[in-house]
Design a protein with these regions (language model features):
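Short S/T/G/P-rich N-terminal loop/turn motif that feeds into the first structured element of a domain
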Residues: 1-59, 63, 67-74, 101-105
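C-terminal structural segments of small proteins and small subunits
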Residues: 69-95
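Conserved short beta-strand edge segments in small beta-sheet-based binding/regulatory domains
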Residues: 36-41, 87-99
Length: 105
C-alpha cells in the first residue's frame, strides 16, 4: 500500500509572529500523534527563499505522511483533528491542501 502525503498551506488573516506561533503550537498539540503517521512536521515560510518559482502566499505549512490512505481517512474524522479545525479556522484567510500518493525508490 502506498504512503500518502498530506501537505497543508495556511494563510492567516493576521500573520503576526504570535498568531503564526499559535498555529504552529496548535498543529503540534492536535495533529502530531495520530495512528498511522510516519512523518510529521510543521513550519513557517522562509522569506529569504524568494526565487521566481517560490510561492510566498502562506504563513504556515503542515507536512504529514501517513502509512496508507486508510490512516489518512481516519485522521480526517478524529476528534482532535476536528477540534483543531474548529479552534483554528477563524484565523485562516486561505487553506490549500495537497494530497499525494508516494512511491518508494
Amino acid at each position: 500500500m502506498a504512503q500518502l502525503s498530506h501537505i497543508v498551506y495556511f494563510t492567516l488573516h493576521d500573520p503576526s509572529p504570535q498568531k503564526v506561533a499559535d498555529l504552529v503550537s496548535a498543529c503540534h498539540r492536535y495533529l502530531s500523534h495520530h495512528d498511522g503517521v510516519v512523518y510529521f512536521s510543521v513550519g513557517t515560510l522562509n522569506r529569504e527563499l524568494a526565487r521566481p518559482v517560490n510561492d510566498l502566499n502562506y504563513d504556515v505549512s503542515l507536512h504529514i505522511v501517513f502509512d496508507c490512505k486508510d490512516s489518512h481517512d481516519r485522521y480526517q474524522v478524529e476528534p482532535s483533528h476536528l477540534r483543531f479545525i474548529e479552534e483554528q479556522k477563524p484565523a485562516w484567510k486561505q487553506v490549500r491542501v495537497f494530497d499525494s500518493d508516494l512511491t518508494q525508490a
